Amino acid sequence: MASVAISEIVTQSANLRAELKEWERAFAAQNGGRKAERKDIKKVPEIAAKYKEYSRLKALESSSPNPDDPKSVQLEERPKKRKRAFKDGPDAIQNSSTPRKTAKGALETPSKNRLSSSHPSQVDPYISPTALRRLFSPSTHRTPLKTAIGPTPQRDGKALGLFDLLSESGGSTATPSADRVASVRAANVRTPSKRKTMDTIMEEDEDGEEESPRLGRTPASSGKKWMLSALFATPTTLRYSAMVEDGNHITERNLGPPTDPEGTARDVAGPETPSFLRRSNSARYATSHSANPSLSPIAVRKPPQFVGKGLSALVQGLRDMEEERLEDDLDVLREIEAEQAALNVEVADSQAPAEIIGRHWKKKGQKRTTRRVRMKPVISKPASKPQSASDDENRHQAAGEEPAEPAAVPETQQPRALDAVFSEKQNEEFDDEDDQVSLHTISEPDLDSDPEYGEDIKPVTKSKSFSEKMKEAIGVAQPQPTEDPAKPSKPVIEAEETKKVRARKVNPEAHANYRSLKIRNKNSKGRGAGRFRRR
């Protein structure tokens, strides 16, 4: 009864699972491929009840002591996928190789162990899975992987690689798997020959040895052969093609001119660059086969040594990575600076600039080098009323005298007095010529050494101040006497007229309110003994 109850539980759980799967597919089709979640299941109470029933049945099934294999239950809704049958039955494969002892479960996918009594917290994470532990353990396989790894393909005493099975013309020896298995089965019933079934395709020189059971392939054109051999051929293929050419042209090499033994030795030795640093080894094969006049056994190729990166290569790689990172950072900084420069464009101010309040600043330079003199205007008294000419004539006629020439009207500024002042000043200035420093000589009056200029001027014993001299020079003219001039005064007037009054030279560019400063040394011993002399 227990077995019948367990089988019913398994059948019910399988049917419920099929129904739930159908509902999940329909839900995914309605919602664009989205799988049903817990909240979607709760929205449909019928499906939620089925899920609860299914989980209850699975719990009963797992708690049963001897559960039946669920794979034995046949489902009507989901029939099993039909596997492809072999052509000659499954036992025909055993004839293709020597029967060996099969390892149980060597390459099988491990099935989920539902009766795992160990809790996940008790499982060691560093323990490898059971299948991998069985696959690589020496106790299971005394000879490693007999059924997985076959014999290494060799040719002429050397191991062949993946690309060594290709022919010179570029054709492929691989055939569809079913045809290849059929040809292998056909070959097993015969006495084995030298040529193996999985060898390379026969070249044109070997056509007479043995014919393939299959139809021959279309021969490649000469252009295709050259392109494949020159551009797309691997180094091993180039070496084999060179060996074939050597066999075909042995007589031509024997009849050719003798070669240099030193050059031959150099070619055999090969270039000085190590093989792991050479970019391509195809040229090496082309030069090496020309030195051998006949076919010679090729040394067994050693297993390839994988040369790792050196320290310098690792350091250079790290530097390149750092430079790329720095370049990225610099690009980001340049973009930020460009954005800031675009934001900081100067815009014309809409407000008018405020007027400058106060005195405008001016850089201080050299101060005034000339002394400013303020000349006050002189108020002249009104001159006496001149007598008319008719009265003078009548007076002279009454006296019985000829009318005299009109007397010269005196000027407000007497030239004689001015000349005396300036000559005295000039004499004082030229006493000490070494200490004289003149900045503005244009404003000085030009004085000539005329003997008539200072004849009547007597040297002044006592020096007068500048203000006194100016007062004397700019003096108020005395009014003329009203009485008639005496007769003895005529020759004096005539003598004065005979002397021409020399005109005073005045520089038109000189300013009236400025005079040149005579700056002298402080410690000079000349008259004045000061920086600016007397003031």
Curated annotation (Swiss-Prot):
Q: What is its main location?
A: cytoplasm
One Pfam short name: Drc1-Sld2
Instruction: Select a single GO molecular function from the record's annotations and give it.
Output: DNA replication origin binding
**Compositionally biased tracts (Low complexity):** 405-415
GO biological process, alphabetically ordered: DNA replication initiation; double-strand break repair via break-induced replication; mitotic DNA replication preinitiation complex assembly
Q: Spans of biased composition, class Basic residues?
A: 359-375, 517-535
What UniProt keywords are attached to this protein's entry? Cell cycle, Cytoplasm, DNA replication, Nucleus
Q: Where is the composition biased (Acidic residues)?
A: 201-210, 445-454
Q: Where in the cell is the protein located? A: Cytoplasm; Nucleus
- On the tree of life, the source organism's domain of life is Eukaryota
The family database entries (InterPro entries) matched by this protein are listed as: DNA_rep_checkpnt_protein, Sld2
GO CC terms in record: cytoplasm; DNA replication preinitiation complex
- Compositionally biased region (Polar residues): 110-121, 278-295
Region of interest: Disordered: 58-156, 170-221, 249-302, 358-535
Q: Where is the composition biased (Basic and acidic residues)?
A: 68-79, 455-472
PANTHER family, per the entry: DNA REPLICATION REGULATOR SLD2
Per the record, the similarity remark reads: Belongs to the SLD2 family.
Role, per record: Has a role in the initiation of DNA replication. Required at S-phase checkpoint.
Can you name this protein? DNA replication regulator sld2
Gene behind this protein: sld2
